[in-house]
């Protein structure tokens, strides 16, 4: 646990007295209350998260998370074999039950939003040049499928793969390359929780189902804002410089773009290398077309 003001380590957040009374602990270094969000309502905490208040993020990813993690053993069972394997998995599901449910909700919304956005982008912007120049586009062939379930599965794989790469690369970069969090007990969980909290901004376009307007432009703006949320939240939690976080995020974006599309092309083409190459060439030509014509490049 840490002081949300100066980030120094502390032993406790408050002292409990009879009658459910508590006294918040003062920080030995800065003299401020260690974590004033202990007494905050969840609604006020959520508002401060939206406003990117550093204290709100530090309260959740450091203090609140550690309190939850301490309820469970840090390591799995010592039993070997299939029984021990099953018990470890059950412990993992209990330990991360709340976080997993939030992830499932976010992914479900993100899949639907991507499906809706990609369909509109293809019909409004990509179909005409693809037909004119004979490009084979992943999105076009997937949206032409008659089975909606297959379309949904494609975008589900897209979202989950994209999120998995973001999550894995961010953790590896911070924990192994920059050696951040060496003195933290739950460093991996802290990074994961930070990504979860900031990633939630990506589902705000779901409100456009209630109040329709120029959805493509608005969705793109919100996605750029969500990317800013991720950068800012990682800076708050890790205390790294903006230049480091932006460089890290740019590198991860490039890796995600290079890795994910070829994998999806192989899946859609069912392992047909020639067809997969056509998809990748079509995506490359589309990117060049958008860049050279400066058409919907930020959508």
Swiss-Prot record:
GO terms for biological process: intracellular sterol transport; regulation of plasma membrane sterol distribution; sphingolipid metabolic process; sterol metabolic process. The keyword Transmembrane helix applies. It comes from the Eukaryota. GO terms for cellular component: cortical endoplasmic reticulum; endoplasmic reticulum membrane; Golgi apparatus; Golgi membrane. Glycans are attached at residue 176. The chain crosses the membrane at residues 99-116, 149-169, 190-210, 211-231, 245-265. It is a multi-pass membrane protein. The keyword Chloroplast does not apply. Mediator of sterol homeostasis involved in sterol uptake, trafficking and distribution into membranes. Also regulates the sphingolipid metabolism. Belongs to the ARV1 family. This is Protein ARV1. It comes from Eremothecium gossypii (strain ATCC 10895 / CBS 109.51 / FGSC 9923 / NRRL Y-1056) (Yeast). The gene is ARV1.
């Amino acid at each position: 646990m840490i002081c949300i003001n100066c980030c120094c380590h502390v032993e406790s957040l408050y002292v409990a007295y009879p009658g459910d009374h508590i006294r918040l602990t003062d920080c030995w270094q800065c003299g401020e209350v260690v974590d004033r969000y202990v007494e905050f309502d969840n609604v006020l905490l959520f508002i401060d998260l939206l406003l990117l208040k550093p204290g709100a993020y530090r309260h959740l990813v450091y203090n609140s998370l550690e309190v939850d993690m301490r309820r469970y053993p840090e390591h799995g069972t010592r039993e070997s074999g299939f029984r021990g394997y099953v018990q470890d998995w059950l412990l993992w599901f209990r330990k991360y039950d709340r976080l997993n449910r939030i992830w499932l909700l976010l992914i479900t919304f993100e899949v639907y939003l991507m499906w809706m956005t990609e369909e509109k982008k293809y019909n409004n912007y990509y179909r005409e040049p693809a037909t004119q120049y004979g490009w084979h586009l992943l999105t076009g062939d997937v949206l032409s499928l008659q089975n909606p379930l297959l379309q949904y599965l494609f975008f589900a794989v897209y979202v989950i793969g994209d999120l998995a790469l973001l999550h894995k690369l961010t953790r590896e970069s911070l924990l192994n390359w920059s050696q951040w969090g060496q003195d933290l007990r739950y460093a991996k969980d802290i990074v994961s929780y930070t990504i979860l909290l900031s990633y939630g901004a990506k589902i705000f376009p779901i409100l456009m189902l209630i109040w329709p307007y120029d959805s493509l432009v608005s969705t793109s703006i919100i996605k750029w804002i969500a990317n800013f949320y991720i950068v800012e939240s990682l800076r708050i939690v890790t205390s790294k410089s903006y230049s480091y976080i932006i460089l890290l995020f740019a590198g991860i974006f490039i890796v995600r773009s290079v890795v994910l599309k070829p994998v999806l092309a192989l899946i859609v083409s069912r392992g047909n290398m020639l067809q997969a190459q056509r998809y990748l060439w079509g995506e490359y030509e589309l990117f060049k077309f958008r860049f050279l014509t400066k058409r919907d490049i930020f959508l």
